[in-house]
Amino acid sequence: MSQSDPTQTQKPATPTRFSGTDMRVSFAGLSFKNPILAASGTFGYGVEFEDIVSLDRLGGFVVKGLSRESMPGNPPPRMFETAAGMLNSIGLQNIGARAFVEEKLPVLNMLQAKAAKKKHDIVVIANVFGYTTKDYEETIRILNEGEGIAAYELNVSCPNTKHGGISFGGDQIGRAHV
């Protein structure tokens, strides 16, 4: 991405330099200081890792999957070691959209404000899942009540229980409705 790119509608992210290389990238209208993003499910809600890694050093991160209501996830055992590696079955455990907006997002907003003072940014993307189209709509409506989420990642691999357990991801019409 060139800094003089006339299609750029957003202020470019603060560059991260590696051996003099500008690492900035732009994707789907978002600017990232580098292409390193922590994937959903690997980084909790982000706030848990602030003491380990400065979030403003990442290009961004995707918070673990959020649903309209909290979910306890699967009962133990959730992990099993095999000769081929680890298997897990967490079951999409999460605190729910409302608790995320009330408990986690204010902390992320504070970290974003702190980063902005250093002319850095923290790009937060929320992973959203549901079992019906209405679940996705309602979850995003609740998350939109807060500030600081740059984009949504739709987890369309959850079973659509209203339609015989078919996942949205495998159904082109279902994906289009989401």
Task: Enumerate the language-model features and the residues they cover.
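Conserved radical SAM core fold
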Residues: 67-72, 156-165
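Short, conserved acidic/polar surface loops in the N-terminal third of protein domains
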Residues: 72-76, 101, 136-139, 164-166
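Catalytic cores of alpha/beta
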Residues: 47-52, 134-146
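N-terminal capping/small domains of soluble enzymes
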Residues: 2-124, 129-131
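Glycine-rich beta-strand-to-loop/alpha-helix junction loops that act as flexible
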Residues: 40, 154-157
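Conserved small/polar residues in nucleotide/adenosyl-binding loops
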Residues: 176-178
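Alpha-helix N-cap and loop-to-helix initiation/capping positions
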Residues: 167-174
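Residues at the N-termini of beta-strands
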Residues: 60, 150-151
